[in-house]
C-alpha cells in the first residue's frame, strides 16, 4: 500500500522536476533561432541565385529596402516589413523551369522566427537606405546581418 503511494509521489516529483527545468538559456535559444533564420535565408538565396534560374533577370527588377543600420534583434522588424514583397516576387517567378520548393513555407518560418526573436510588438520604426536593393542583394545583406548578430552574441 505504502509502496504504491511512494511510487506515485516519486513519479509526480520527477514530472515536476522535468517540467520546471529550463531546457536552454535564453541566449542559447536566441542564437538557435538566429541560426535557423540564417539557414532559411541561405536556402532562399541558393534557390534564387542559381544558374538554372531563367527567371533571375526578371526577379532582379523588383526592388527591396534594407535598413540603414541593422545590428540588433529589434532591426528584424525591417526584415519582417519586406517579407510580403519577397513572397510576391517568389510567387510570380514560379514556373516549370524554376520552382523554389516550399518558398511559402520558408517565408512563414522566417516570419515566425523573426517574431520570436524581436517580440510581437511593432514599435520599432525602420530607417531604410535610400537605394533599393535587388532580391539577391537583399538576401545577402540579411544573411550578413544575422551572421554579425550571431558573432556578437558568441563573443
UniProtKB/Swiss-Prot annotation:
Pfam families: IL2. Glycans are attached at residue 23. Keywords: Adaptive immunity, Cytokine, Disulfide bond, Glycoprotein, Growth factor, Immunity, Secreted, Signal. Its main location: secreted. Disulfide bonds join 78-126. GO terms for molecular function: carbohydrate binding; cytokine activity; glycosphingolipid binding; growth factor activity; interleukin-2 receptor binding; kappa-type opioid receptor binding. SUPFAM superfamilies: 4-helical cytokines. One of its GO terms (cellular component) is extracellular space. One of its GO terms (biological process) is interleukin-2-mediated signaling pathway. Cytokine produced by activated CD4-positive helper T-cells and to a lesser extend activated CD8-positive T-cells and natural killer (NK) cells that plays pivotal roles in the immune response and tolerance. Binds to a receptor complex composed of either the high-affinity trimeric IL-2R (IL2RA/CD25, IL2RB/CD122 and IL2RG/CD132) or the low-affinity dimeric IL-2R (IL2RB and IL2RG). Interaction with the receptor leads to oligomerization and conformation changes in the IL-2R subunits resulting in downstream signaling starting with phosphorylation of JAK1 and JAK3. This is Interleukin-2.
Amino acid at each position: 500500500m505504502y509502496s504504491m503511494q511512494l511510487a506515485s509521489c516519486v513519479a509526480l516529483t520527477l514530472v515536476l522536476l522535468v517540467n520546471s527545468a529550463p531546457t536552454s538559456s535564453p541566449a542559447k535559444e536566441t542564437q538557435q533561432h538566429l541560426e535557423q533564420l540564417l539557414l532559411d535565408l541561405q536556402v532562399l538565396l541558393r534557390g534564387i541565385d542559381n544558374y538554372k534560374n531563367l527567371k533571375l533577370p526578371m526577379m532582379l527588377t523588383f526592388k527591396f529596402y534594407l535598413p540603414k543600420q541593422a545590428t540588433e534583434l529589434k532591426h528584424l522588424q525591417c526584415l519582417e516589413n519586406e517579407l510580403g514583397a519577397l513572397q510576391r516576387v517568389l510567387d510570380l517567378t514560379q514556373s516549370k523551369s524554376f520552382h523554389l520548393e516550399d518558398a511559402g513555407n520558408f517565408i512563414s518560418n522566417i516570419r515566425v522566427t523573426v517574431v520570436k526573436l524581436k517580440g510581437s510588438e511593432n514599435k520599432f520604426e525602420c530607417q531604410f537606405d535610400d537605394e533599393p536593393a535587388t532580391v539577391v542583394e537583399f538576401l545577402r545583406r540579411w544573411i550578413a546581418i544575422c551572421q554579425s548578430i550571431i558573432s556578437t552574441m558568441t563573443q
